[in-house]
Design a protein with these regions (language model features):
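Short alpha-helix
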Residues: 195-210
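Class I SAM-dependent methyltransferase SAM/SAH-binding core
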Residues: 75, 81-129
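A conserved beta-strand element that flanks and buttresses the S-adenosyl-L-methionine
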Residues: 142
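Conserved class I S-adenosyl-L-methionine
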Residues: 4-68, 87, 171-193
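Conserved catalytic loop of SAM-dependent methyltransferase domains
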Residues: 215-249
């Protein structure tokens, strides 16, 4: 999710990173941070679509709990350029997908991807923290690389919990603070650094929102594209230190059955 951020009252934390000062409006703080031109460009690359989105969705499908509701109605929250839409259609065979993004330009890009889907797809502009959807109206929410762009993360998760039907699934994949705080990412992208979390922190956030996230439904990883050297040293035989923080976390959480 990207540009022209709406205004909000100051959240729980302050945005002190110089890279986001230009995202302030008036006396309030933005609810999310607009992406850089490089970030927009990167979302259109093969690295993003193949190694970030496709790999994540296949992993998330594998992590889904057996007791979860069948995902007939899917919400893709923060759909960006929409490369996830054909993948959601192929992997889960839903009846319908609703894709939302706060950036109208990304909505246009998602609309082009919607034409590649077999199921019914609606693409619209929307705010993940204020979803214009009835309670219990979707069976699955995809939240892929969205929360680390948001300041009101708890509000977004509360909305996902509200619109999910009992037994519905939240598919969450996030880049962790270990990656977001690295020098290359800080130079090329823009994020609200004060709200970044570790893999453990994201898992706690999801559970605190009322979701069930079983240990066997979550994984952490450090893919090559999340390393400063893009994995070159690993190809030469270097091994990451034991206990090093992962850069990515993926989990399939479930809203409890009532």
């Amino acid at each position: 999710m990207s540009p022209e951020a709406p205004i909000a009252s100051p959240p729980d934390c302050a945005l002190s990173n110089p890279s986001v000062k230009d995202a302030r409006r008036g006396h309030g703080l933005v609810r999310w941070v607009p992406e850089t031109w490089f970030g927009h460009w990167f979302l259109g690359t093969n690295v993003w679509s193949r190694y970030a989105v496709e790999v994540a969705l296949n992993d998330l499908a594998r992590l889904m709990p057996d007791s979860a509701r069948r995902p007939l109605r899917i919400l893709d929250a923060g759909s960006g350029p929409g490369v996830s839409l054909p993948l959601l259609d192929r992997i889960f065979s839903p009846e319908s997908i609703l894709a939302i993004d706060i950036n109208p330009k990304e909505v246009q890009r998602s609309g082009r991807q919607a034409g590649l889907c077999r199921c019914e797809v609606e693409v619209r502009a929307g705010d993940a923290t204020e979803l214009d959807l009835p309670d219990g109206s979707v069976d699955m929410v995809l939240c892929h690389q969205l929360l680390h762009h948001l300041v009101p993360q708890k509000e977004a998760l509360a909305e996902f919990h509200r619109v999910l039907a009992p037994g519905g699934t939240l598919l969450l994949a996030e880049s962790c603070d270990e990656f977001i705080s690295s020098i290359p990412v800080r130079m090329l992208f823009r994020h609200p650094n004060e709200t970044q979390r570790s893999a453990t922190g994201y898992q706690r956030l999801v559970r605190d929102a009322g979701f069930i996230l079983a240990p066997d439904c979550v994984e952490t990883s450090t893919p090559f594209w999340s390393l400063p050297d893009w994995g070159l040293r690993q190809k030469l035989g270097w091994k990451r230190p034991a206990g090093a923080e992962p850069t990515e976390v993926a989990g399939a959480a479930m809203k409890p059955w009532e």
